[in-house]
Amino acid sequence: MRYSSKKAFLEDIETEYARLEELLADLTPEQMVRPGVCSKWSVKDILAHLNEWHLMALDWYAIGLTGTRAAIPAMKDIRPLNRKIYEKHKDRTLKQVRSSFEDSHRKMLKLIESLSEKQLLTPGYFPWTRKNAVITYLSPNMASHYRWAMGHIRKWKKRELAE
């Protein structure tokens, strides 16, 4: 999704986060750790995935401010990276993952809120983003990623109810 303003970006994030939280509220802890939501991943694993991508985006920004270009994964590297993320977090408890996800979401919001509209939307404003606007690196890890997660969770819930 292309955003024309910081306000629209923040509103989309707030809306999708609330929708995700509402969807999660209907699940029991047992359901949230059951595999099979997205391949072998559980809802907990999806939240760990979202958290890790938040942390990577925060790192990219912080590294970029030092004048260094962060190692942002190429499309061909995403699948192996996601497998590593799963392996890294699979043994964490649901409580740990929920807490980490909520914390990283807040940190992303704080970063976005700290940026002016010009900083957020102007291509090349930050040298590390080259010709892109910084929103290009932040937006895929927020509302659109939440929509991706909700799509998998909803499909899984339908399958679960059908059984």
Where do the model's predicted regions map?
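Active-site flanking loop/helix segments enriched in acidic
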Residues: 28-31
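Short, contiguous alpha-helical
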Residues: 33-80, 120-163
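Structural signal for well-ordered, non-membrane alpha-helices
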Residues: 17-25, 54-62, 102-116, 147-150, ...
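Acidic/histidine-rich alpha-helical segments that form the ligand environment
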Residues: 81-121
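Extreme N-terminal tail/first-helix region
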Residues: 1-19
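A short, mixed-charge helix-start or loop-turn motif at secondary-structure junctions
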Residues: 2-6, 87-91, 131-135
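Hydrophobic packing residues in well-ordered alpha-helices of helical domains and bundles
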Residues: 10-13, 97-101, 139-142, 146
